[in-house]
Amino acid sequence: MASKYGLTAFTVQEATNGATYYTYKSENLTLNGTAAQTTSSWTNQPAKEVVLFAPAGTIDDDAITINLKVNGAYGDNIVVNFDNLPFTIKGLLVEAVKLTGGSGDDDVITVLSFH
C-alpha cells in the first residue's frame, strides 16, 4: 500500500490498471421524482468504481436514470431497471453521480464509490 497521497501514491501498474483504491464513500440518495445528486465533491479524487444498490424494501418504481459527471461535464443518461440493481460502473473516473426516478414516494438508492 502506498505511503503518500495524490497521483504518485501508487506504483505505475497500480495506477494504470485502476485496481487500487485509496478510500471509499457511501451515500444514500432519496428519489422522489426530482434529481438527487451525490453531495460530496469527487473532483480532486474521482471514483474508479461506483456501485448503486437499494436497501431491502425501499424500491417500488420501474426505472432509474443515471447521469455521470466525467471530465467536468455530465454525459448522456443511462436508464436502469430497479430489477438490475446492484449496478456497477467501472472504467471511468467519475466526479459525481446524479440519479432521477421515483414518482412521489421516496425511493432510497445507496451510492458506494471507491476512490
Mark where each language-model region is.
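Noncatalytic modules at the cell exterior or secretory-pathway interfaces
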Residues: K48-V50, I89-D107
